[in-house]
C-alpha cells in the first residue's frame, strides 16, 4: 500500500511539474509591429552606407538601421569628470566600445568575414596609438596571438599547427589577475613612454581572444588608466 501511495504521489508530482511547459498548436499568421509608427521612426532610422556590390557586378543601395541603445541609461562604470572632458567613446565593428582621446580622428578599422575585428586609432601626429583586436570565433586567429601573454597555450597552438609567440628576452612585463586575463606593458624602442595593455581569452564554447594596446605620451598618461579600466570592464 505504501508503495502504491508513493507511485501515486510520484505520478502527481510528475504531472504537476510538466504542467508548466505548454505545447501550442501552430497557427500561420502575418507578423505585426509591436511599437507605434512614431516610436519606430524615432528608434529605427536609416543611414546611408553607400552601395553593396554583388559578385556579378550589380549594386544595390546599402543602409544601416539605428536601434535603441541598451546602455543609453548609463554605463556601469565610473569615469572621472576631468578625464571625461578629454575622452570620447567609439563603437568599433566586431571590437566593441572603447574610450579614446577626444581629439583623435585618424582611424583604421576592419571587420573580417570570419567575425574578427581590428582597429588602430592614432593621434594627429601619429606618435600615440590605441590598437585593438578581437579574434571572434576564429581559433586559428586568436590562439597563436594569445600564446605571447598566456604561454601555457603554446603547446595547444603548436599541436594545431597555428604557431605562436615567445618572449625570450623578457621584454614584456605581465601580470595575471586571473587565469584568462593578462595586464601587460613593454617599451618600444625610440618611444618615450611604455605601451600598456590587456589581453583576454575565453575557451568555454570556442576560443576567443581580444587585446588592447595603449601608447600615450607624458601629456596623456593620466588617460591610460581610465581607457584600460573601461576596456576591462566592458569586454
Predicted regions mapped to residue ranges:
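Sec-dependent N-terminal signal peptides
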Residues: 4-15
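Sec/Tat signal peptide C-region and signal peptidase I cleavage site
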Residues: 17-21
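Conserved polar/disulfide-associated segments of primarily extracytoplasmic proteins
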Residues: 23-68, 109-235
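Short, compositionally biased strand/turn segments
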Residues: 71-91
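Extracytoplasmic
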Residues: 84-85, 93, 101, 116
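Proline-anchored loop/turn motifs at beta-strand termini and strand-loop-strand connectors
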Residues: 93-109
Amino acid at each position: 500500500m505504501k508503495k502504491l501511495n508513493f507511485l501515486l504521489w510520484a505520478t502527481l508530482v510528475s504531472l504537476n511539474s510538466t504542467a508548466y511547459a505548454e505545447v501550442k498548436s501552430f497557427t500561420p499568421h502575418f507578423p505585426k509591429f509591436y511599437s507605434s509608427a512614431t516610436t519606430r521612426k524615432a528608434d529605427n532610422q536609416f543611414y546611408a552606407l553607400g552601395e553593396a556590390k554583388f559578385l556579378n557586378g550589380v549594386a544595390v543601395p546599402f543602409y544601416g538601421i539605428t536601434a535603441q541603445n541598451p546602455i543609453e541609461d548609463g554605463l556601469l562604470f565610473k569615469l572621472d569628470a576631468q578625464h571625461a572632458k578629454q575622452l570620447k567613446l567609439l563603437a568599433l565593428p566586431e571590437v566593441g566600445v572603447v574610450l579614446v582621446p577626444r581629439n583623435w580622428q585618424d582611424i583604421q578599422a576592419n571587420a573580417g568575414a570570419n567575425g574578427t575585428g581590428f582597429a588602430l586609432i592614432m593621434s594627429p601626429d601619429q606618435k600615440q596609438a590605441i590598437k585593438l583586436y578581437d579574434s571572434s570565433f576564429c581559433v586559428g586567429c586568436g590562439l597563436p596571438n594569445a600564446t605571447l601573454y598566456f604561454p601555457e597555450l603554446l603547446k595547444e597552438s603548436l599541436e594545431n599547427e597555428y604557431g605562436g609567440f615567445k618572449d625570450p628576452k623578457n621584454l614584456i612585463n605581465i601580470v595575471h589577475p586571473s587565469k584568462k586575463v593578462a595586464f601587460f606593458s613593454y617599451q618600444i624602442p625610440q618611444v618615450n613612454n611604455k605601451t600598456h595593455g590587456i589581453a583576454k581569452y575565453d575557451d568555454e564554447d570556442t576560443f576567443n581572444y581580444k587585446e588592447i594596446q595603449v601608447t600615450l605620451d607624458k601629456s596623456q598618461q593620466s588617460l591610460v588608466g581610465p581607457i584600460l579600466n573601461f576596456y576591462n570592464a566592458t569586454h
